[in-house]
Design a protein with these regions (language model features):
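PLP-dependent class I/II
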Residues: 1-168
């Protein structure tokens, strides 16, 4: 049977000027084979908690996953992590609002600067998060040349687009 795992770890990082994110579980009627992942690590900058959650509507699948995770000792968490997880989601709203405003300002600055000052490179305006996709095809460089350019001349380490597929 096919299972769909929907990684929603960035779901809360949507800019106020964009459409709110709709989790996959709210869009499909048959959730029998759906697993949704969430975590406060990105939203509330709490990766040190080492805690995330799986939403598994199907009780059989939930039991099977619990058995696998128990066998690998992956369901052990400490009270500090659980408290931080809950506190982030219960009381982190004001902090998240400030974070999104800060990230939106950075997004606007980066997109404006790249699109006006860097010929051959086009920045896409993201709807959320802290990542920006750059279209560098206008530079006319191979993937290897592009990587060398960014690392050695621009002093910026990047995830090369080619690792996401031919269209980069």
């Amino acid at each position: 049977a096919l299972m769909v795992v929907s990684d929603e770890i960035h779901c809360d990082l949507v800019f106020p000027d964009k459409q709110p994110h709709q989790m996959l579980g709210r869009l499909v009627s048959d959730q029998d084979a759906l697993v949704t992942t969430v975590a406060p690590s990105k939203t509330f900058n709490l990766p040190g908690l080492g805690l995330s959650a799986l939403v598994v509507p199907n009780p059989e699948h939930r039991r099977a996953l619990k058995t696998v995770f128990d066998s690998m000792h992956m369901l052990q968490c400490n009270p500090f992590s659980m408290t931080g997880f809950e506190a982030g989601y219960r009381h982190g709203g004001p902090w998240l609002d400030e974070l999104l405003a800060y990230l939106q300002h950075n997004r606007d600055f980066v997109v404006q600067t790249v699109n006006s000052d860097l010929p051959g490179i086009r920045a896409f305006e993201p709807e959320g998060c802290y990542l920006v996709w750059l279209d560098c095809r206008g530079l006319g460089m191979s993937d290897r040349e592009l990587k060398a350019f960014f690392v050695h001349q621009a002093g910026v380490g990047m995830n090369p687009g080619i690792s996401f597929g031919q269209q980069g």
